[in-house]
Amino acid sequence: MRDFESVDNNMMIGKLSAVEIADRFGTPLYVTDENALRDNFRKINEAFNRHMPTRIHYACKANTNLAILRVLEQEGSFIDAVSVGEVDISIRAGFAPNRILYSGVSVPNKDLKALVAREVLINIDSISEMRRLTKLVTDIPVSIRINPAVGSGHHEKVVTGAKGTKFGIPKDQVIAAFREAKELGLRPVGIHAHTGSGGLNTQPFIDVTQVLVAFANEIEEELGISLEFLDIGGGIGIPYRPEEKGLDLDSLAEEITYIVKENTSIPTFALEPGRFIVADSTVLLTRVNDIKEAGEKNFLGVDAGFNTLIRPAFYGSYHHAAIANRFSLPGEVNYDIVGPICETSDYLAKDRLLPKAEEGDLVAIYDAGAYGFVMSSQYNSRPRCREVLVDGEHASLIREAESLDDILKHQRIPSRLML
């Protein structure tokens, strides 16, 4: 969780007050601090490259805004994409295809054709996918994703590496998969696994590295395949709560890269952070519409709901909240911060001690840059909101708000109903 400066009780984002930004662009509004975004990437990039050559593949499913991707392209990031759409958005943002790794699941043939045409590196998820790919092309480099039977994550819904999940080739089929890839004419150059999302425990990252190292050595000994990179996926979490501490990134990088360097001849390490890079770079600003006392409950009704930020409703996730125009004042009242959606589960925060609020106040929801806008919806026929990028004292619109026309533009009434 980031610390923000306060000037005259106003929360500052860059050199601008949150109130000033909200007054200019309206609410609800996602606001990203470009300098925080760059700093986060540099921190993880430098931590790992200090010990061995490392490719940081930004997991763009966390946030695919073109401007954010452009910033990361400038910083030298690679991309982890999970759909053809993410591949194409990344290319439009300036990424060369050879900086994109595609890791799909349940991949249809039409997507395989598109990926081959775009010449991105495909991270094969299943033997079925591999066989279908070789009907289109052979003699291309590929990576193979395994299921390491090592799972972790902030919620059971984001654990991807545990035994029984849908991702990757099961451990007992890994050697056979690499053998078949070689026999089919593919060139396996990488091995990949992903444990889950949002972890603050170092052990799963160490465990999955050890699993991949063991397989890499077995693959080289049995099949004569010398891999070019080892990829442990993403999942590095951030401290969403004030009392939480983030991972010691330098220690983690040193320990993991040591395992790879000392036990393999693989020249390049790779990982796929998403949340770590974008989450705390962004706040969601939302205006107080309504204040309601209901028995022991005090509700702050704001103009953002789970249509805007679904993580609290979907995962039960904690996001820190503050009243941006009363930023330095002490807490007086416990509030539930709720939205305008017609669902009981529509809340952004529960039981938060905040300064006594008034209608028109501005609430800031922290750490909203990862899985925020990308998971938003038009539920209750509410258009999706604007996004803004702040660089010091400059604020730029990087996504326009939708309108009712945007909601309706792909809908049609059959002519027979117009009679």
Give the residues covered by each predicted segment.
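Short, glycine- and charge-enriched coil/turn segments that flank and shape catalytic ligand pockets
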Residues: R50-M52, E221-G224, E243-G246, G295-E296, ...
